Design a protein with these regions (language model features):
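Acidic/histidine-rich catalytic cores of soluble enzymes
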Residues: 48-49, 90-91, 181-287
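A short pocket-lining beta-strand/turn micro-motif at the edge of beta-sheets
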Residues: 261, 293-299
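N-terminal pre-domain/capping segments
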Residues: 2-157, 175-178, 185, 192, ...
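A short helix->loop->beta-strand "cap" motif at the edges of active sites that frequently abuts
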Residues: 120, 196, 291-295
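Active-site groove signature of glycoside hydrolases
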Residues: 155-175, 194, 199-203
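Short acidic/polar active-site loop segments enriched in Thr and Asp
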Residues: 88-89, 161, 294-295
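Active-site beta-loop-alpha junctions enriched in small/polar residues
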Residues: 39-41, 94-96, 127-130, 168-170, ...
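Conserved beta-strand positions in the central sheet of alpha/beta enzyme cores
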Residues: 90-92, 124, 164, 264, ...
């Protein structure tokens, strides 16, 4: 690495070291705080449009994004809703609910004011529809980074600590990992001037292979780049018979935790005891806490067994219950966290 690059990364590390509290919780007696991901309410916001299917909704979001959310509650009031309905004090916005507002600085400043008025932290913004950061064509990658940059400006107005990006791409996994890491480093540097970190989530396809995503993040050298491990997004494809292929979620989260700046507690369905049926939250939160993570853990309910409001509350109760159990047991490190390997396999 050239001396100029070393100096540049060193300066960035200083910036993010000073700003660490923006993505970590304030000093409390709790092991973690709970945030609410706006996508937990996607059926509430999209209403009849989501019932018509994702193809219909995707087209509407491209052609008339304001109409897509016109029938539900105002997305601008999300922070207020989080506080008044659930008494949750931190939120994770989703940009697709605001596609029609990109560039409208007054709109996002007003959202920030509403959040402040209700004592709600604008933790992060999840970005969709911004292009392929792992594309082979350099021009396409550049266009994608410009789209991300535009949304980073909106997240900055909200007072967010970070943005979550997607890293779609193509080509051989090794080369794609290298291209993607370079895009992430560029975005990480852009984020320095905005006070924003850039995080990547396991979000389907190759990104749901925990070893591959850990490889990408180990190649990315910027201190403002990290991960957002999601408890449930580990479906990596389908087999010849059309059955889903899943990466082991506990191993995947373990591999991503060394890079974590945020965590997403995905939930779908609950048993009579209030436990999530697909993910053992006790085991998963042990992995998270053993990594030394003490930031926000975001509720992201995507089930249909309960309505979205009840699903959020069920996830909230489960997180609170497990947190209380670990707190009373003086949680100790068990060494469960798996460090990122440099190799990865696509057939796991």
């Amino acid at each position: 690495m050239r001396r100029r690059q070393v100096i540049k990364l060193g300066a960035a590390a200083g910036v993010f070291g000073e700003a660490l509290s923006r993505w970590a919780i304030a000093e409390t007696n709790r092991l973690f705080e709970i945030s609410l991901a706006q996508f937990s309410l996607h059926r509430t916001y999209y209403g009849e449009h989501i019932e018509k299917g994702w193809v219909h909704l995707s087209q509407l979001l491209r052609e008339d994004p304001a109409a897509a959310v016109a029938g539900g509650p105002d997305p601008a009031d999300f922070a207020m809703l989080a506080r008044t309905e659930f008494d949750i004090g931190a939120v994770e916005y989703v940009n697709q609910f605001y596609f029609a507002q990109l560039g409208n600085e007054a709109y996002f400043k007003e959202m920030a004011r509403k959040a402040d008025d209700h004592g709600v932290v604008s933790h992060l913004m999840m970005l969709d529809g911004t292009g392929r950061l792992g594309a082979i064509d350099a021009g396409e990658r550049g266009d994608a980074m410009e789209k991300v940059k535009a949304w980073m400006g909106m997240a900055q107005l909200l007072g967010c600590a970070m943005v979550r990006v997607n890293i779609e791409g193509e080509g051989e996994p090794e080369e794609r990992a290298k291209r993607t890491s370079e895009s992430l480093d560029t975005l990480g540097e852009i984020g320095v001037g905005m006070g924003l970190a850039v995080v990547v989530e396991n979000h389907g396809g190759l990104t749901s292979n925990g070893a591959w995503l850990a490889k990408v993040l180990s190649l990315a050298k910027h201190p403002g780049v990290g991960s957002l491990p999601d408890f449930g997004n580990f479906r990596i494809g389908k087999d010849a018979e059309g059955k889903d292929i899943w990466y082991d979620r506990y191993r995947g989260v373990s591999q991503l935790m060394p890079f974590a700046k945020a965590v997403s507690a995905k939930s779908y369905d609950f048993d009579s005891a209030g436990d999530e049926r697909m993910t053992d939250f006790t085991q998963m939160l042990r992995i998270v806490l053993d990594a030394g993570y003490r930031g926000y853990i975001g509720i992201e309910y995507e089930g249909r067994q309960l309505n979205e409001f009840d699903g959020i509350r069920a996830t909230q109760r489960l997180l609170q219950r497990v947190r209380a159990a670990y707190s009373s047991n003086s949680h100790s490190r068990s060494g469960f966290v798996e460090r990122a390997d440099t190799a990865f396999a696509l057939d796991e």
